[in-house]
Regions:
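A structural boundary/capping signal
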Residues: 23-209
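Positively charged n-region of N-terminal signal peptides that target proteins for export
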Residues: 1-4
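Bacterial N-terminal signal peptides
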Residues: 7-18
Length: 209
């Protein structure tokens, strides 16, 4: 366990060195998480590209389970999240794909969709329930469409984002949240009702709305 923890810390140290101002905003949230989960609403049209992905990856889009899961955020589970976040961010090299194309990083390259799908697959391989691993779409502070992996835990809904190094609470990102997949099935999406205003603990500034 000690060697595993030291390895994870080494990965995190390398990852922190490569990210910019967005990462700096979120670093204060790597210890304390909010318990507030996302609030979802009506059914919405799934993101472009999902249908093509499901045609090629049927197993990924089948019904995940009967009940939504909230994973207990034990030290080992937390370490899983940090390792997967760091490893996938380092393993996949950024490349702008068409937003209509979703897929895994078969050639080692991809966009935000690729990072989110790879993290979901990696956590499933480590024994995490699919019903706790949810893809979510948002609009960034610069107005760009973005996809991330949201993990439902006892410590809150946590985000694994390719734009920053740490795992963060969803309320701490300067995004306008749009929609999220249903817990049981990747092909069903719902609106995200709560759109929190990010407050910088360092500067006391609010970003987004």
């Amino acid at each position: 366990m000690l060697s595993r923890g030291l390895a994870a810390l080494s990965f995190l140290a390398l990852a922190f060195a490569g990210f910019g101002s967005l990462d700096a905003r979120a670093q204060s949230d790597t210890v304390a998480f909010s318990a507030a989960p996302m609030t979802t609403g009506a059914l919405v049209v799934p993101p472009a590209g999902l249908l093509g992905f499901c045609v090629k990856n049927l197993a990924e889009c089948q019904r995940a389970g009967e009940m939504p899961a909230v994973v207990d955020l034990s030290p080992d589970r937390r370490l899983d999240l940090e390792e997967v976040q760091t490893l996938v961010n380092a393993r996949v090299h950024p490349r702008e794909n068409s937003r209509h194309e979703w897929g895994f990083a078969s050639d080692g390259y991809g966009d935000c969709n690729t990072y989110a799908l790879e993290k979901r697959r990696e956590l499933v391989a480590r024994g995490w329930p699919k019903t706790a691993l949810l893809l979510a779409s948002a609009v960034t502070e610069t107005g760009e469409g973005h996809l991330v992996l949201v993990v439902r835990t006892s410590g809150g809904d946590l985000v694994l984002d390719n734009r920053l190094a740490p795992v963060v609470d969803w309320t701490r990102l300067p995004y306008r949240w749009v929609s999220r997949q249903n817990e049981q099935r990747l092909t069903i999406w719902v609106s995200i009702e709560a759109r929190p205003i990010y407050t910088s603990s360092a500067a006391g500034q609010k970003v987004g709305g």
